[in-house]
Regions:
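C-terminal amphipathic helix plus adjacent low-complexity
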Residues: 160-170
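Soluble catalytic domains of membrane acyltransferases
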Residues: 1-144, 148-149, 157-162
Length: 170
């Protein structure tokens, strides 16, 4: 089991390409998406494709719930679009890091790069709790990855980097 970071998340194509990459690699993807995506006729389709709706305004126990479910699986990849949106932002969402830390599983970096028309998997990061050091590794990997729409890329940075190490739950 792993947390698969899908970045840079810059277009609607990212979703389909990342799912295809996960399936081709023999992983069973479970991906997190905003709950609005699951409204109406798309709900059963997105659920069948491994979707898990997220209320971004009230995430509550999402990290603990996903971590508990993920810890029991072996070929499962929890796919997280770390930027949380296709638009350029200031920070990545920290859920991918917190899920991996809580479930005691590695973070696998994956990418799509529009300028080179390539995609694939990068290094595996084992979260140490030193968020800044771990994010330095992640930033180094994504430095030359532009996404399908490079102008929408968000630099990998978490608000948590300024704080103390992230504690692990008991």
């Amino acid at each position: 089991m792993c947390v698969l970071v899908a970045a840079p998340h810059t277009s609607n194509w990212d979703f389909f390409l990342m799912l295809a990459m996960a399936w081709e690699s023999g992983l069973t993807p479970r991906w997190l998406g905003k709950r609005e995506m699951f409204a109406g006729p798309m709900r059963p389709i997105f659920r069948a494709l491994g979707g898990v709706p997220v209320d971004r305004e009230n995430p509550g126990s999402l990290v603990a719930d996903v971590a508990a479910h993920a810890g029991a699986a072996t070929a499962l990849a929890v796919v997280v679009p770390a930027e949380g949106t296709r638009a350029k932002g200031e920070y990545w969402k920290s859920g991918f890091y917190r899920i991996a830390r809580e479930a005691k599983v590695p973070i696998v970096l994956s990418y799509l790069d529009g300028p080179t028309r390539t995609g694939g998997f990068g290094p595996t990061v084992h979260p140490s709790g030193d968020v800044k050091a771990d994010m330095d590794l992640i930033r180094a990997f994504y430095a030359d990855k532009g996404g399908v729409k490079p102008e929408n890329k968000t630099t990998p940075r978490l608000r948590d980097e300024e704080g103390p190490p992230v504690p692990m739950s008991a």
